[in-house]
């Protein structure tokens, strides 16, 4: 099948960057450069496509320009025509492709290769430290209809039962949204450990994480989101890829995620508990700030794609999602890499 490079996507994703709503002040210690500019390459192959397959559908998460990153598309290489879509719940953008019979039979050795290349500038996302944020703290206010989804449960992030009980225990003595979030942050920082041994970790199952008290970034941030939502505080899940702090190029092994919560006077405030746990000297920094050593691809859990997938909602959306004849298909080879460039 012929490879097409969709240069028109340059116009779809490069938007004027907004100004940051708040900058780090001199009293917020910075550990990394405030910006990083790099080429990001997202490559994968759908392999072993059955020759009798009639339809292969592919959804690819696409980073987008916002206050914290500026994204330019350098190239999209795909075996068929793709189109940009956006799901309405969280606003996540994606590329969508369909391979249909007889194109499937004509594909090389039953596989389909996709490569997306970007130039990205990522900026530090800073709201200040806890002392600064506490000055304008208020009790959680009535949530607008547009934010109601962000106080509702997800499949693996309940807001009742054990998570509600934990919220009462951990945050109940605090009144403000910032103070409650800090109590939840401190509890998870102290009581969990970053540990990817064995099974169960990586799904972001808030109840499992509270019982096991270990896991990766999804497991740290799911109970945080659940406790805050149980208190009526909007909270959301962000996911993308990490950039090694002391390297200027190389492969990226897997995803990274963090969280945000909403305070009435300040707006959205980021936290990264798992990174704080791995670098204890950054415990204070990662409440209210996240560094530029990352790129965000999507927001949210229980994600319904556009066009809608036949399978269930996705737990999170950072890797390509593929269906063959209406069923999820996971025979994929994936590779992600970056290279620093001068801005």
Identify the function of each model-found stretch.
Residues 1-5:
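Positively charged n-region of N-terminal signal peptides that target proteins for export
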Residues 7-19:
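Bacterial N-terminal signal peptides
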Residues 23-126:
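Intrinsically disordered, low-complexity N-terminal segments that are enriched in acidic
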Residues 50-51, 63-67, 121, 168-175, ...:
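Sec-exported extracytoplasmic/periplasmic mature domains
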Residues 87, 113-194, 200-211:
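Acidic low-complexity segments
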Residues 177-184, 213-228:
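Active-site nucleophilic cysteine motif
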Residues 222-310:
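Hydrophobic/aromatic-rich core segments of domains that either
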Residues 290-343:
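Low-complexity, Gly/Ser/Thr/Pro-rich intrinsically disordered linker/tail segments
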